[in-house]
């Protein structure tokens, strides 16, 4: 039988976790000093007066390396708990993890073949 009162802790956690950032933004908006002088509108570069524009364009290669790094970082986040409980989970989870790693390897080979991993 599906009982709705079993989810009271979930709803309380959801409401509290939603209220904390909302209250933080409201309180900081009320208490923060408002000043729009020239110092607020200039960019900050380690206490030195900025020379030239603060905007510069990064090459797309940087984003490709960052994206591949994030993919393998997420892979580590998923595979570490799996490795810690490998003996409990069984063979089916091993096959799923193997498929996950295989998809990542195929994606890495594809990125390598397309030249996304070359810096120059």
Curated annotation (Swiss-Prot):
InterPro entries named among the record's database cross-references: NAD(P)H_OxRDtase_bac/plastid, NADH_UbQ/plastoQ_OxRdtase_su3, NDAH_ubi_oxred_su3_sf
Entry superkingdom: Eukaryota
Any one GO molecular function term: quinone binding
Pfam families linked: Oxidored_q4
UniProt keyword list: Chloroplast, Membrane, NAD, NADP, Plastid, Plastoquinone, Quinone, Thylakoid, Translocase, Transmembrane, Transmembrane helix, Transport
Subcellular location: Plastid, Chloroplast thylakoid membrane
Membrane-spanning segments: 9-29, 64-84, 88-108
Membrane topology (UniProt): Multi-pass membrane protein
Recorded catalytic activity of this chain's protein: a plastoquinone + NADH + (n+1) H(+)(in) = a plastoquinol + NAD(+) + n H(+)(out); a plastoquinone + NADPH + (n+1) H(+)(in) = a plastoquinol + NADP(+) + n H(+)(out)
EC assignment: 7.1.1.-
One Gene Ontology CC term in the entry: chloroplast thylakoid membrane
GO process terms (BP): photosynthesis, light reaction
Family: Belongs to the complex I subunit 3 family.
Function description: NDH shuttles electrons from NAD(P)H:plastoquinone, via FMN and iron-sulfur (Fe-S) centers, to quinones in the photosynthetic chain and possibly in a chloroplast respiratory chain. The immediate electron acceptor for the enzyme in this species is believed to be plastoquinone. Couples the redox reaction to proton translocation, and thus conserves the redox energy in a proton gradient.
Summary of subunit composition and partner proteins: NDH is composed of at least 16 different subunits, 5 of which are encoded in the nucleus.
HAMAP family: NDH1_NuoA
Descriptive protein name: NAD(P)H-quinone oxidoreductase subunit 3, chloroplastic
Gene symbol of the encoding locus: ndhC
């Amino acid at each position: 039988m599906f009982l709705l009162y079993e989810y009271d802790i979930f709803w309380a956690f959801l409401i509290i976790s939603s209220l904390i950032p909302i209250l933080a933004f409201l309180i900081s908006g009320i208490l923060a000093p408002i000043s729009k002088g020239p110092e607020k509108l200039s960019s900050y570069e380690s206490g030195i007066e900025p020379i030239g524009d603060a905007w510069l364009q990064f090459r797309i290669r940087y984003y490709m390396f960052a994206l591949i790094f994030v993919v393998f970082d997420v892979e580590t986040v998923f595979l570490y708990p799996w490795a810690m409980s490998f003996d409990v989970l069984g063979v089916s989870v091993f096959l799923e993890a193997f498929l996950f790693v295989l998809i990542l390897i195929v994606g890495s080979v594809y990125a390598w073949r397309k030249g996304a991993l070359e810096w120059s």
